[in-house]
């Protein structure tokens, strides 16, 4: 359409072109029928084009009609596309509104971390607080700078021993009140003190900003100090975590490897000590429970078994038996002898020394006796031996050629019944007191008296020893009588 109008204007510059512009009479109710209108407009345009081609005389009219039709068709298509765009925008707007309704409202202002402080609290003094003329003030430093309601005072007093604490009150030389201390920072030799002023004291901030460089004082009664050695205990680093805070001990880095190794070792020992203490407490509680549950009864306890050497029935080891075993054997032997009613076979001292401890119930002593030596019974000094019986020779008449304990082998091999049949004992000597040697032994100076013997404990053993002693005396008497007879009658 635009090409036809342009060509016509060039051909006929003086002719006025009547151009019909489309009217904006779009009905909102017919937005969805744009496709149908487009279909109905297409055959109408084709019909007009065919009629325009057939009528050659009315060329201008057909051209203008076709132009108007094409303009109306194009305007109709543009209206349809505009209607579709409006509909799409309406649907998109509804979707955006739904999304806004579903999402939470976005926070207003900057995003804050967990430990971040939004606004610093400003300490304020009471309104009626005044510094009188009698109040003592002490110079502390000079006004260094002022910015954003903050007054910085550079201290001229060293803080190596102590520094001011938060809450101390500052003033000027003319006792003009500045405010309360908010923060201490900088080196200890000359620390910096920061004072935060509230927004309501804007005039005071402007006045102090003009008086920078003047001396600053502290109100001595309201000054609070903290010792520096307490601050040195807290170990700090230049690093910071995600919250711009000091790192904990387990996250700190060391410039010295030895210090780092020592720190890790200390931490490991602390963990091990803690685990050991917990385990000990758990074991103690378990042991208490087990002891209470497993306490045995008195009846269920096992019987104690004596050692092998202490039992009477146990064989002797290395020739030793305990005292209890020896006493039990003595009791058993005495009970057996009392039941049988017979005395043991007489045994001479020579043969007693040959017996081993395993064959005799009593342990062998150094003197060869079957029982331990005891102190003899006390003998009276005026004791007199009874006279020998009639017909019996005195021991002085005998020749002590044969020592005691060394009898002839033939005689030693003879049993007591044979001796009694060979020489019936018609004369008997009364038994001497226990521990008194025979007559011949008392009169023989060459005889070495054996150590006195004491009866062992127990009535049965004492009786056996007495019987054995009597038998030995009888054998010795028979021997002397036999020798005396052979000397008097050599023919026999």
Curated annotation (Swiss-Prot):
Residues 1-117, 237-351, 472-492 are annotated as: Disordered. Its main location: nucleus. Residues 35-49, 279-289, 324-333 have a biased composition (Basic and acidic residues). It comes from the Eukaryota. The modification Phosphoserine is found at residue 255. Transmembrane segments: none annotated. GO terms for cellular component: nucleoplasm; nucleus; sno(s)RNA-containing ribonucleoprotein complex. Residues 472-485 have a biased composition (Low complexity). Residues 334-351 have a biased composition (Polar residues). One of its GO terms (biological process) is pseudouridine synthesis. It is found in: Nucleus. Keywords: Nucleus, Phosphoprotein, Ribonucleoprotein, Ribosome biogenesis, RNA-binding, rRNA processing. InterPro entries: Gar1/Naf1_Cbf5-bd_sf, H/ACA_rnp_Gar1/Naf1, Naf1, Transl_B-barrel_sf. Residues 172-230 are annotated as: RNA-binding. Disulfide bonds: none annotated. Residues 60-70, 77-105, 243-259 have a biased composition (Acidic residues). Residues 264-278 have a biased composition (Basic residues). Present with 1810 molecules/cell in log phase SD medium. During assembly of the complex, component of the small nucleolar ribonucleoprotein particles containing H/ACA-type snoRNAs (H/ACA snoRNPs) which contains CBF5, NAF1, NHP2 and NOP10 proteins. Interacts with SHQ1. Interacts directly with CBF5. Interacts with hyperphosphorylated C-terminal domain (CTD) of RNA polymerase II large subunit (RPB1). Belongs to the NAF1 family. RNA-binding protein required for the maturation of box H/ACA snoRNPs complex and ribosome biogenesis. During assembly of the H/ACA snoRNPs complex, it associates with the complex and disappears during maturation of the complex and is replaced by GAR1 to yield mature H/ACA snoRNPs complex. Acts as a competitive binder for CBF5 probably required to prevent non-cognate RNAs from being loaded during transport of the particle by inducing a non-productive conformation of CBF5. The central region (136-221) reveals a striking structural homology with the core domain of GAR1. PANTHER family: H/ACA RIBONUCLEOPROTEIN COMPLEX NON-CORE SUBUNIT NAF1, H_ACA RIBONUCLEOPROTEIN COMPLEX NON-CORE SUBUNIT NAF1. This is H/ACA ribonucleoprotein complex non-core subunit NAF1. The gene is NAF1.
């Amino acid at each position: 359409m635009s090409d036809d109008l342009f060509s016509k204007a060039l051909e006929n510059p003086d002719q006025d072109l009547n151009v019909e512009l489309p009217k904006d009479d779009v009905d909102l109710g017919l937005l969805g029928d744009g496709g149908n209108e487009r279909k109905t407009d297409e055959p109408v345009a084709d019909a007009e084009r065919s009629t325009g081609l057939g009528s050659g005389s009315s060329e201008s009219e057909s051209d203008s009609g076709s132009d108007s039709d094409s303009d109306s068709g194009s305007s109709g298509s543009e209206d349809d596309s505009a209607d579709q765009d409006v509909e799409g925008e309406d649907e998109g707007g509804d979707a955006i509104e739904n999304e806004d309704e579903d999402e939470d409202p976005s926070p207003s202002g900057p995003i804050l971390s967990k430990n971040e402080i939004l606004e610093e609290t400003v300490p304020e003094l009471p309104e009626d607080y005044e510094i009188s003329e009698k109040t003592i003030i002490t110079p502390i430093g000079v006004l260094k700078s002022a910015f954003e309601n903050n007054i910085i005072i550079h201290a001229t007093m060293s803080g190596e021993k102590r520094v001011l604490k938060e809450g101390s009150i500052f003033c000027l030389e003319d006792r003009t009140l500045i405010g309360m201390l908010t923060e201490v920072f900088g080196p200890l030799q000359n620390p910096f003190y920061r004072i935060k002023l509230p927004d309501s004291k804007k005039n005071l901030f402007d006045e102090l900003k003009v008086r920078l460089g003047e001396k600053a004082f502290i109100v001595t009664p309201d000054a609070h100090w903290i010792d520096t050695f307490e601050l040195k205990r807290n170990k700090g680093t230049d690093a910071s975590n995600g919250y711009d805070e000091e790192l904990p001990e387990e996250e700190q880095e060391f410039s010295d490897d030895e210090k780092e190794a020592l720190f890790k070792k200390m931490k490991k020992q602390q963990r091990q000590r803690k685990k050991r203490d917990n385990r000990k407490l758990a074991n103690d509680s378990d042991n208490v429970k087990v002891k209470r549950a497993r306490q045995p009864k008195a009846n269920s306890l096992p019987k104690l078994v004596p050692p092998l050497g202490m039992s009477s029935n146990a064989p002797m080891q290395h020739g030793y038996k305990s005292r209890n075993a020896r006493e039990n054997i003595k009791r058993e032997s005495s009970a057996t002898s009392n039941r049988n009613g017979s005395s043991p076979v007489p045994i001479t001292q020579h043969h007693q020394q040959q017996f081993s401890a395993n064959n005799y119930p009593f342990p062998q002593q150094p003197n060869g006796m079957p029982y331990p030596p005891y102190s003899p019974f006390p003998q009276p000094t005026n004791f007199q031996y009874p006279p020998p019986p009639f017909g019996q020779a005195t021991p002085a008449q005998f020749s002590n050629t044969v020592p005691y304990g060394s009898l002839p082998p033939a005689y030693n091999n003879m049993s007591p019944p044979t001796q009694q049949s060979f020489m019936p004992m018609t004369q008997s000597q009364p038994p001497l007191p226990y521990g008194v040697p025979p007559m011949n032994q008392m009169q023989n100076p060459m005889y070495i008296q054996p150590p006195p013997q004491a009866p062992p404990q127990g009535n049965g053993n004492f009786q056996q020893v007495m019987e054995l002693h009597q038998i030995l005396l009888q054998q010795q008497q028979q021997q002397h009588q036999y020798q005396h007879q052979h000397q008097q009658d050599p023919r026999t």
